[in-house]
């Protein structure tokens, strides 16, 4: 009560105006007190925010020219001093108190929101589902390969993992680790970002690769399972899902350089998007190789699709390394971690690894290992593009 009283005295009692890009037609009239990110979203101005407004992804940057107050400690770890001097802020951390003037990229106004329908939601690996969503009839998601969408996660309670539809071939690990026993709860609506696996020619639908997020078994009583992935794993054909997009910056560079793609786990999504666009649409003549790390044969997906591309295009090679192949896999290919296999089998003998463009998406340990390996070869950071996730 004391805090509410103090806030009521500190904030203006009337409406405030947010001027966007100096265009009075885009003005937003709102009550003070909310974050800039949430107010903009409420007016269909969808800044990207992979963390759902938690201040950790630093993707909701915009310029607050007037009325934003001083930059906060929660922002300075993400915004450089030079950018801060140019009035860059994190919209999720800026509380609306006074009239404001802000600048956002023009492409933000092309972002839309839809109610999509689940077409299918099948496992492609033990802990990864391929979620396919259809947009409303006549709608099209005009995006670049490597883009992502944000999906709204509603409030839900007592969502039981035992209700998930998991194909029988993946049951052994779910049984062994008793994953069926988990229950998820979400106390308030949030949103999360997922890279699209579909490419622009498939623009009337959205395909995601989503890995279920669970804590290690010893922490099940202390740490909850992932809010978004639990919700997504429970979706059934015909269900309605709210998404917004397109967003993104993990795009194909318009050069003639050689390209090396490195992926692991659900990091497959933007790899598929890029590679299908490069070869099915652009029919590129660039030299391209794809290096994917999986645990075992059961965790390999879209395998036949990439083999087909390899057969049709002599300028493409597809390489897989298994870190823990099973006896029944009868695996005769590469083993070990993908960064080491890429180094030993290709880059170590390449005439100039520093002239290659690298595109990476996968779990942080894989990204970190690849970074170290490429740094040891003298590859400049500007030659590396990331779609990193936690």
Residue spans for each PLM region:
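Fe-S ferredoxin-like electron-transfer domains
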Residues: 2-5, 9, 77-134, 139, ...
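Reductase modules of NAD(P)H-dependent flavoproteins
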Residues: 2-53, 64-83, 284-390
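Short coil-to-beta-strand transition motifs
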Residues: 107-116, 185-192, 300, 332
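Ferredoxin-reductase
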Residues: 117-237, 295, 321-325
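A short, basic/flexible loop-to-alpha-helix module at the beginning of a structural domain
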Residues: 231, 244-257
């Amino acid at each position: 009560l004391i805090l509410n009283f103090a806030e009521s005295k500190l904030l203006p009692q009337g409406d405030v105006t947010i001027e966007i890009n100096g265009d009075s037609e885009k003005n937003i009239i709102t009550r003070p007190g909310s974050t800039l990110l949430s107010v903009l979203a409420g007016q269909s101005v969808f800044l990207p925010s992979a963390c759902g407004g938690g201040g950790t992804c630093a993707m909701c940057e915009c310029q607050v020219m007037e009325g934003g107050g001083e930059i906060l400690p929660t922002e300075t770890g993400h915004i450089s001093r030079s950018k801060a001097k140019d009035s860059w802020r994190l919209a999720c951390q800026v509380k609306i108190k006074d009239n404001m003037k802000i600048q956002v990229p023009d492409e933000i106004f092309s972002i839309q929101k839809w109610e999509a329908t689940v077409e299918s939601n099948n496992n492609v690996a033990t802990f990864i589902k391929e979620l396919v969503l259809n947009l409303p009839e006549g709608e099209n998601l005009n995006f670049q390969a490597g883009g992502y969408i944000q999906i709204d996660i509603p409030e839900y309670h007592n969502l039981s993992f035992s209700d998930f539809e998991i194909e029988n071939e993946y049951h052994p690990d779910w049984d062994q680790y008793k994953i069926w026993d988990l229950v998820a709860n979400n106390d308030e609506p949030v949103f999360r970002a997922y890279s699209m696996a579909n490419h622009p020619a498939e623009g009337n639908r959205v395909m995601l690769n989503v890995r279920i997020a669970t804590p290690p078994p010893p922490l099940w009583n202390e740490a909850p399972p992932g809010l978004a992935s639990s919700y997504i794993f429970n979706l059934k054909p015909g269900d309605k899902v709210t998404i917004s997009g397109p967003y993104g910056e993990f795009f194909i560079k318009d050069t003639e350089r050689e390209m090396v793609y490195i992926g692991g786990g659900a990091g497959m999504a933007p790899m598929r998007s890029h590679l299908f666009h490069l070869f099915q649409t652009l029919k590129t003549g660039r030299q391209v190789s794809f290096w994917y790390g999986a645990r075992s044969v059961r965790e390999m997906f879209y395998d036949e699709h990439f083999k087909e591309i390899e057969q049709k295009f002599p300028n493409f090679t597809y390489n897989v390394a298994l870190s823990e192949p099973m006896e029944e896999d009868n695996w005769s290919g590469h083993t070990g971690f993908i960064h080491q296999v890429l180094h030993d089998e290709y880059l170590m003998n390449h005439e100039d690894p520093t002239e290659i463009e690298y595109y990476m998406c996968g779990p942080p340990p894989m990204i970190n290992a690849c970074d170290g390996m490429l740094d040891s070869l003298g590859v400049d950071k500007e030659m590396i593009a990331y779609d990193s996730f936690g």
